[in-house]
Amino acid sequence: MTRPQYYRIKLKRIPGKYRSYQPLPVTRYSPSKLRKQVEAFAIYFKREFDYAIREFDAREKDPYTAYLFPDPHANVWIGACCFRPESYAYDVDSETLRWIWLHPYHRMKGVLTEAWPFFRASHGDFFVEPPLSLGMLHFVLRHNRGSRFFGYYEKLAGQSQLGFVNGISKAEH
């Protein structure tokens, strides 16, 4: 795979029966085509943030609820996120938003802001698992003031102002 192909983002058309203005829930029982689309966004997430592991596999059997974000005007999927019953690395007794990826064009355009109340209603006071980009940290601080995890996010924000995010200096990113 050439370098330009490695970084190419392909947005797939939304099949007619799944067209909506709301994020589409995807579970381990959903059609393979939907699970594979979530997996594709997990691969983009891995590449963008230079992670060693992929956060989602379409074949996995552990419980999760992922969501595909639609662009209803263009009828394409523009991103995904995944909730799990627990955190991978943190000792919290809560559902956890383990990862989220949106196409760069659609970031900061209200997609997540619009979906957030739905996520809170569906998953309660969930934990947003670090590491968080500075943009995501800012979003979480703005939209989770009533969360029992708010103090933790404030602590992360303090570290980021000192040049650290999750214990890693910005220079190391």
Predicted regions and their residues:
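A short glycine-leucine-enriched loop at secondary-structure breakpoints
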Residues: 109-114
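Non-catalytic substrate-recognition and accessory regions of acyl/acetyltransferase enzymes
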Residues: 1-106, 117-127, 132-137, 142-146, ...
